[in-house]
From Swiss-Prot:
Post-translational modification: Acetylation of Lys-136 contributes to its nuclear localization and enhances its interaction with KPNB1. Deacetylated by HDAC3.
Xref: SMART domains: HMG (SM00398)
Species annotation: Pongo pygmaeus
InterPro entries: HMG_box_dom, HMG_box_dom_sf, SRY, SRY-related_HMG-box_TF-like
Residues spanning the membrane: none
Listed name of the protein: Sex-determining region Y protein
Chain positions covered by the region annotation Disordered: 180-200
GO biological process, one term: cell differentiation
Main location: nucleus
DNA-binding region, residue range(s): 60-128
GO MF term list: calmodulin binding; DNA-binding transcription activator activity, RNA polymerase II-specific; RNA polymerase II cis-regulatory region sequence-specific DNA binding
Domain of life: Eukaryota
Family: Belongs to the SRY family.
């Protein structure tokens, strides 16, 4: 069966858009038996009129049990006596009072509930209870929420990449230093103590400068590589 929307579209796009066709538009509207309902994900699903009977069956209420039969009048009475009391608190009070009743006091309400269940079975012989699960929205703070696996993985990859980058920079720097130190003149053991002390002092000063330069270079390279990556995490 062609839906009303597609029929209207075909009518407006046709060349013979005459007054006679315009008169048939209300008939198309009446003959359309499609019921469109909005689903939970904001999309629309179409059901025929025959399938909509199942939704009526789902809306049938359950037969009342003994507690519901007893609490109807009690809830109304308690709400009138305590107008500021919340419904949840009233339910707690009614549950406590129901537990305090004896079996003899509960028995008339069990009999009434059995009668209501028998009437319900006669009226709805194919009834089956289908509980509707309600999504529980738990509001938690950001600190208690679990970390996103993708962000954790990106963080671990970033740390590993930074370690490998620093290791490569360290190896390259040490190789250049070894190459430079290999061209230094050998120490003359036969020289005077003053010359050996002067050479030792200059070598120590050179090593300190090289160490400071290496640390500065590595730190700068590390943070330059770290900051752009953090912007995508």
């Amino acid at each position: 069966m062609q839906s009303y929307a597609s029929a209207m579209l075909s009518v407006f796009n046709s060349d013979d858009y005459s007054p006679a066709v315009q008169q048939n538009i209300p008939a198309l509207r009446r003959s359309s038996s499609f019921i469109c309902t909005e689903s939970y994900n904001s999309k629309y699903q179409c059901e025929t009129g025959e399938n909509s009977k199942g939704s009526v069956q789902d809306r049938v209420k359950r037969p009342m049990n003994a507690f519901i039969v007893w609490s109807r009048d009690q809830r109304r009475k308690m709400a009138l006596e305590n107008p500021k009391m919340r419904n949840s608190e009233i339910s707690k009070q009614l549950g406590y009072q129901w537990k305090m009743l004896t079996e003899a006091e509960k028995w008339p309400f069990f009999q009434e509930a059995q009668k209501l269940q028998a009437m319900h079975r006669e009226k709805y012989p194919n009834y089956k209870y289908r509980p509707r699960r309600k999504a529980k929205m738990l509001q938690k703070s950001c600190s208690s929420l679990p970390a996103d696996p993708a962000s954790v993985l990106c963080s671990e990859v970033l740390q590993l990449d930074n370690r490998l980058y620093r290791d490569d920079c360290t190896k390259a720097t040490h190789s250049r230093l070894e190459h430079q130190l290999g061209h230094l003149p050998p120490i003359n053991t036969a020289s005077s103590p003053q010359q050996r002390d002067r050479y030792s002092h200059s070598t120590e000063l050179y090593d300190n400068r090289v160490t400071l330069a290496t640390k500065t270079y590595l730190d700068a390279a590390f943070y330059d590589n770290l900051q752009p990556s953090l912007s995508y995490v």
